[in-house]
């Protein structure tokens, strides 16, 4: 089975990403240096690579160049604290798929998950995102894992404030599922807030907020 390779010298940061991806059913390898990364690339079957830009013995850019020299067609994703203007153009020209802000932790781990899903399910595999606004529980985590097998990633939040933040962060969410009663209001508060924001941006060339299908329930049942 192909594995996800993460290359990062911050052991605490990489542990959390590794743990997240393993819970979604993926095998994950970790390297802390450029040399360790090269060794694993040669030894293992790699699905995708996520790497920091600056490493203790070199640069993630060096790894990207190594892949191209070897003609390995492995999707390569950067996550780093460096401003994109200093490296993104070069990285994309050399074949990187995407460059992410390391501090946007949720975005990093969910983007890695999306690329891993698409790569493991073949070219053209669809990956849909829905937003669940509901108090977290064991059952919601189980539902999230099962939906992922069908190419649906459920982003889970517990408050209206968090939900609005996610909608601004992820432009590709397709549907909202929402409990009636939430910690900071009720579902209708969120619904009207969403409609208001969508109305503000509807006439812009590239709206950053749009109205989405919205479902409200006291208990959400999903049959798989």
Predicted regions and their residues:
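Non-catalytic signal-transmission and effector/linker regions of two-component phosphorelay proteins
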Residues: 1-5, 105-129, 134-144, 161, ...
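Conserved sequence signature across two-component system core domains
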Residues: 7-8, 31, 49, 133-134, ...
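Two-component/phosphorelay signaling modules centered on CheY-like receiver
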Residues: 10-36, 137-156
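Helix N-cap/capping motif at the beta->alpha junctions
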Residues: 30-39, 60, 156-165, 187
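Short amphipathic alpha-helix used as the core "switch/output" element in two-component signaling
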Residues: 39, 61-73, 188-209
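Active-site beta3 strand of CheY-like receiver
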Residues: 44-50, 55, 171-177, 182
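Two-component signal transduction core modules
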Residues: 49, 76, 99-100, 176
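Alpha4 helix (beta4-alpha4-beta5 surface) of REC/receiver domains from two-component response regulators
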Residues: 62, 83-100, 106, 188-189, ...
